[in-house]
Amino acid sequence: MTDETVKEPMNAHKVAETERMKVMPALFGMRFAQVEQTVYQLMDRLCSTYQGGQWELYTLSNSSFYMAPRRADKLLIQWDGNGFTGEMSADAAGIVACLFTYSALSFQGCETCGDMYHLLLDYGCFCPKARIGLFQFPDLRVGCRSEVAVHAGL
């Protein structure tokens, strides 16, 4: 491993209740409501038992962002697009829903979402807690950048 592949640890910071209304407009501009609604809709498609609820918002030290349902139990995730069925934490499921959202909206011209996709995928590949859920999805596993995968021991 060279010095170029060694990265500082990435951290997630939960957004304080007093800042929740500001963070998404600051990151996504006029598209913030579209991003938020798409994440909720994708979670509804990913998890048949998901019925809405409170979400936690997280900013990442690499400038990305994700949101995850506020719940302690694991979620049964199913995705017909690749035949995936498996359980993952609410945190990992939220990251998956955000990755799918960012990917879809990037193809609709949202450059910020394209950037967020790659930054969040880097975090997901690096963070052991998230990696457990993400790497169950073959589509996401192959997207990890090589230097992140090397540093994460993949």
Regions found by a protein language model. Give the residues of each.
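Terminal domain-start segments
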Residues: 1-46
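Hydrophobic, Leu/Ile/Phe/Ala-enriched alpha-helical segments that form helix-helix packing faces
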Residues: 43-47, 99, 123
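Amphipathic, interaction-prone secondary-structure segments
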Residues: 30-74
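Short runs of predominantly hydrophobic/aromatic residues within well-ordered alpha helices
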Residues: 20, 51-54, 92-98
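Short, flexible helical or helix-coil boundary motifs
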Residues: 31, 35, 50, 102-106, ...
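Short, charged/polar micro-motifs that form catalytic or ligand-binding hotspots
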Residues: 14, 44-47, 81-88
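Compact, glycine/acidic-enriched structural inserts
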Residues: 78-121
